[in-house]
Design a protein with these regions (language model features):
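Patatin-like phospholipase
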Residues: 1-209
Length: 209
């Protein structure tokens, strides 16, 4: 058994359809020989086939990571190759789930995940457009300080504790985003759209009233 990396332009025209079928053959289904050979989905050998693109001279690549089992082929990446990765934190359903509604949802998630990367949106499970400075984010976090609570203790003990709990790295703005996401998830706020940070804050405040 070996991996086959082929180019459409190098294939005889009467083999193109067979090779497209071969690239999507899933071993849980009954396999049929194509051209006298058995093939299986290339994702079982390399879930992110960057090697084929790099060896064919592509320098700027947008790679989409999809969660699941599989192997990533390791090879030396040339210094002049730029790769932008798009990944998701959402549950996309099973590989063999052919439900139309799930497929439409996955497509929508894909667009949102791409926008997160390409437009610099914030959030892990929500898609948030930034409008606040780091100082404004800190002030908003300080607004949650209860009357009489020690300010230094809040900044040096409580906020770092929250950051660790929410796995929030970076500055105060990123900590605020993690807090907002946590609150939004608990309140069942829809995450299938883009929010401006101030809009999400207002949405959460309205939900508490």
């Amino acid at each position: 058994r070996k991996a086959l990396e082929g180019k459409v332009n190098d294939l005889p025209e009467d083999q193109i359809c067979d090779m497209l079928l071969a690239s999507a053959y899933h071993p849980t289904f009954k396999l049929e020989k194509l051209g006298g050979k058995f093939y299986t989905d290339g994702g079982f050998v390399d879930t992110l086939p960057l090697h084929a693109l790099v060896t064919n001279g592509y320098k700027d690549i947008i790679a989409v990571r999809i969660p699941g089992i599989g192997h990533n082929r390791r090879f030396r990446m040339p210094d002049d190759v730029n790769i932008t990765y798009i990944a998701t934190n959402a549950d996309l359903g099973g590989v063999l789930n052919f439900d139309a509604e799930q497929s439409r949802r996955d497509i929508a998630i894909g667009y949102l995940d791409a926008k997160r990367v390409l437009y610099g949106l914030y959030g892990k499970h929500y898609y948030i457009e930034r409008s606040m400075t780091d100082r404004e984010a800190l002030n908003m976090l300080l607004d949650s300080l209860e009357t009489g609570e020690n300010l230094r203790q809040f900044c040096e003990r409580d906020l770092p504790r929250v950051a660790r709990h929410l796995d929030a790295e970076g500055d105060y703005y990123e900590l605020l985003i993690a807090v907002l996401e946590d609150a939004a998830a608990k309140q069942g706020v829809d995450n299938m759209r883009i929010y401006k940070d101030t809009e999400l804050v207002s949405r959460l405040e309205e939900s508490r009233e």
